[in-house]
């Protein structure tokens, strides 16, 4: 691993933390195209597994800050929705071995473009002023959302937060201020619960001079996660300053750019 590669990973770690804190997405949308660009020999499953593992680390850092801010969320919702994500991620990971790589990348690109459009539309809507109590319908619909989102996350390595945040934002029991907290909780709990499948399955590719178990490369994860500490304090300060409209527009443009970039990288170049 050369200096250029390490520098790129450090930048990704710093930017991933900002994305996780402000938008409630764990950086998987950033890491997937970066890993595909820098490590061209990686199997698509290794890209997904390493990306999702990085998301756990960056989300865990932000969770520590969120807990200190004492923003309340439903414990039952968090556990059930995280369980749905675990199931979905495992199904997506194993399904990826039966799909052509171009199909998986196509799903990733389509997800980015759909989410960007949805985010642009959401930016024009007023912020939710009040929320309802968590009910059975919210728990059920939320679990279906997270299972489906987890499947796409396990298939593509997106991380889940970019999918979960727009989905759970639609639930009447979730306030906008809770979206990032719920997403980060699910990325940590759902991600940790999903790592077993990545660790026990033998990977046909091993990167030299790095520490790797199964499909997860811990050297890459360590560099990205440790560098994310650099922007953690700044991310939380920025989160308090930005308005909902600015946040939604910024996220929409980021998702749109990543979708276009990945398309060019995989299908044009």
Residue ranges of model-derived segments:
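Structured core of small recognition/catalytic domains
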Residues: 180-184, 190-193, 198-204, 213-215
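Juxtamembrane transmembrane-helix boundary motif
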Residues: 1-21, 32-44, 63-155, 170-171, ...
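Alpha-helical transmembrane segments and their lipid-water interface positions
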Residues: 28, 55-66, 92, 190-198
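Generic alpha-helical scaffold signal
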Residues: 25, 29, 54-57, 73, ...
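Small-residue-rich alpha-helical segments with characteristic i,i+4
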Residues: 164-188
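Transmembrane helix-bundle signature of multi-pass membrane transporters/permeases
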Residues: 17, 48-56, 180-191, 255
